[in-house]
């Protein structure tokens, strides 16, 4: 077996609309292509020995053990690799259940599709599954050592790229509210929402977190001073820079016991509490100095009581947790080392922040804390004796939490909310020491020890005891108050031909509203009139540029088949999805071999439309019209024929449609007709002589209308939109050169050639074509381009693209010539492979009042060449 290619899908895609995170592994079975599993000695027995948990896979039989029954009866290796890849992820806690395996048009080569949780781990699982299955084929076994290494690697990959627990809590709540989100950086900054409505979080810092409040919270001494000046109880303390000042500082705060900690520490690192004599103070100072970047050490009075963390969000208390330091409880027989090992076996404990709780790590701090209690790692604890392993109660060092939200006294609630406002934090974690949180701090001699920016949520979301608290909900309530949108209107456009023109027209229409419009196209990414990036930008990365931009109010996204197949969509849903047509282009690429398969690719756009939105479908294209059966949204149709049965049936059901009737672009709904504009007054239709441009206008007008735009705005948009080289480069760009005209169009498939041909056939004068085609198209497609050219043009020059796309020089041209001669053996043609030379010759030799039509590889170069020619009177 050999992996030929691996794709990672991150959005709705060809294989599944709902399951966005999929690996597509193109697998060559090689010598196993004709060997089902029941013909491989020992394979079934080895598989259930190595992965007995595969018994839980139902597969097509639909019951426990169903997949293993398929293996025993005989199934092919691609199918088995799919299930093994899923199970390897399951064994490390990454539950992924969806899979598909389909043979391609090349015998023995399969697309193995399976779900993933973590991208890197998902790709690794596929490679490991192939290794495992190959080993079982060759030897009947796969060592448990190798399996454990695979699982360990999977865990590591997942842990390295996983979101932190607090971030995970927030994005899970965002998912529940259907607020879209995306990662912005490796530091786990997350964007919530799209465009102008976006908010950002990093851990539990948010777009609302003020820099002054965060900086103040990081300055422990400054925080204490501000709180003290506000009359809020804080520990008596001082800050020193040198060891020589330590003894005096202890005396200044009232003597022992004291707390010694770094000024700039976090997560409890470098802190020693309840320091009771000089030797302990020396050790505590050294520990704090190791963790301090500034050399500044805080010495504070130690206050008896329990450690509490109070969470305040947007000025309101939302949760309280009592924190217990890492500890073990004796059973009368086990050593402390053994008790720690038993504690760490708790499935809720993981490394770092990987789980609800953190495993207890034995380090110098733990040993020092034990020794202060009179124990060491080999000590056998009496039954029920508790030994603490950390001085502080941070969950990140193995502590646990008990929910106390319902216990806190109302006066303390008021005080904590005041603390957050005094410091200036939108999300504040306030550390309180008090003997009883249910009583006012003034009665218990309690104090505010610290105020933290970016507080952790684990202790509140999953306390060891007490009620879990959904603390992410108030965060999202703050970022997106009731009635505040998180999304911007998204209009997605796909099809074989006309995508770019329709996208640009839609964007132009929306600009009439005064909104900031971002759009992607084959030519470039634009925000309003400003070009962000030139080039083919019709994939998910380009769409994400628009969705990430904080100025964009409306997104119009040209969406080509390549991006859908390669990575899925950048968005989970859209408001309007336009499918213009499906034609025989790009067939044979990406395992899309039939026009029906291509229709399934394009259908993704229609299927992701939100139920409240509209799928705008071409009623004149049966493959597109049939997509309505899969759509969950409302449907609106457009047609060049008002009598189209699909249109008539739709209107009878009070549906909305756009049609070309009596020379007008009109919108129909039920019994009424709304005429948007006469086609001859829409510049892009070339005076009504370009039917395919009228169809594009119908689609754009209908999309804008169903998304709520006023007809007057739409009318203004179509009246002022032109097919100039500046506004729509490569889309019916007509140049008047005085003695003759030149037309530039990026058509590169038979349907596109026919559409341009419908316009060219009406030209009164010589029709001179400079024709070519992409080398990666099928032979039959290139031959058909030649046939169409022979039908349309009086004279033809056949040229080739510089990028041969896998063909040898002259091969593409030969196929086009073959089509020309099949259609018209006496056709006037010649072959000039260089595009520039070919176009120059056509421009030099075209007859007066003639039309030169070029289908260029480089639109910009062709336009530049034509513009350089001065009009000849």
Curated annotation (Swiss-Prot):
Organism superkingdom: Bacteria
Catalysed reactions, semicolon-separated: [L-4-(L-arginin-2-N-yl)aspartate](n) + L-aspartate + ATP = [L-4-(L-arginin-2-N-yl)aspartate](n)-L-aspartate + ADP + phosphate + H(+); [L-4-(L-arginin-2-N-yl)aspartate](n)-L-aspartate + L-arginine + ATP = [L-4-(L-arginin-2-N-yl)aspartate](n+1) + ADP + phosphate + H(+)
UniProt keywords, alphabetically: ATP-binding, Ligase, Nucleotide-binding
Any one of the GO BP annotations: biosynthetic process
Occurrences of domain ATP-grasp (ranges): 224-480
Alphabetized SUPFAM superfamilies for the sequence: Glutathione synthetase ATP-binding domain-like (SSF56059), MurD-like peptide ligases, catalytic domain (SSF53623), MurD-like peptide ligases, peptide-binding domain (SSF53244)
Similarity comment: family membership: In the C-terminal section; belongs to the MurCDEF family.
Official protein name in the record: Cyanophycin synthetase
Protein species of origin: Synechocystis sp. (strain ATCC 27184 / PCC 6803 / Kazusa)
Gene: cphA
